[in-house]
Amino acid sequence: MLVTLTPELLLQAYTQGFFPMAEGQGQRIYWYEPDPRAVFELDKVHFSKRLLRVIRQERFEIRYSTAFERVIRACADRPSTWISEEIIRTYIRLYRTGYGQSVESWLDGELVGGLYGVSLGGAFFGESMFCRVSDASKVAFFHLVERLRGRGFALLDTQFANEHLVQFHVVEIPRREYRQRLKGALALPCKFR
């Protein structure tokens, strides 16, 4: 049975630990609940000394949720992507309800990197990142972590671990533990924007 992807369905899925991915443009959407689940411990995220120097230089202007559609489309703009047009349209609708978020790195008035995700209670579900200038997405990620820490978020879900995320000390936890953390985080009255 095919189900239409809606913002309401997305939010319900996230509260249960599921997220969607498409198999290429125009392809069917599948729902995932990985075990183990990749998350960041917000008080243990690691940033290299080199990256911290780049951040201190304030080379990038950081903006929050001002160019959500441009960010998600930039994340999808690669030879192989799980971000279908249906996913893009639905997440844009989710953004308009206040749950879809982006963190953007701008350089000389141009969007050069960033990430997008979903905030729900005290949980942030990171979806994807893109980078057109060296360090732009890493700087956006740093500012995401700082914002989540400062606003009392308890969970930064990154779904799957990969080589890029290892440098920031991503950890994998069993599904049961993830569900417990998710339940606690969802109960928090946090606001991203």
From Swiss-Prot:
GO CC, alphabetical: cytoplasm
Biological process terms in GO annotation: protein catabolic process
InterPro entries membership: Acyl_CoA_acyltransferase, Leu/Phe-tRNA_Trfase, Leu/Phe-tRNA_Trfase_C, Leu/Phe-tRNA_Trfase_N
Keywords associated with the record: Acyltransferase, Cytoplasm, Transferase
Domain of life: Bacteria
Enzyme Commission number, as recorded: 2.3.2.6
Catalytic activity: N-terminal L-lysyl-[protein] + L-leucyl-tRNA(Leu) = N-terminal L-leucyl-L-lysyl-[protein] + tRNA(Leu) + H(+); N-terminal L-arginyl-[protein] + L-leucyl-tRNA(Leu) = N-terminal L-leucyl-L-arginyl-[protein] + tRNA(Leu) + H(+); L-phenylalanyl-tRNA(Phe) + an N-terminal L-alpha-aminoacyl-[protein] = an N-terminal L-phenylalanyl-L-alpha-aminoacyl-[protein] + tRNA(Phe)
Pfam family, one: Leu_Phe_trans
Residue pairs linked by disulfide bridges in the UniProt entry: none
GO MF annotation list: leucyl-tRNA--protein transferase activity
Record localization: Cytoplasm
Sequence similarity: Belongs to the L/F-transferase family.
Biological function: Functions in the N-end rule pathway of protein degradation where it conjugates Leu, Phe and, less efficiently, Met from aminoacyl-tRNAs to the N-termini of proteins containing an N-terminal arginine or lysine.
The protein's name in its UniProt record: Leucyl/phenylalanyl-tRNA--protein transferase
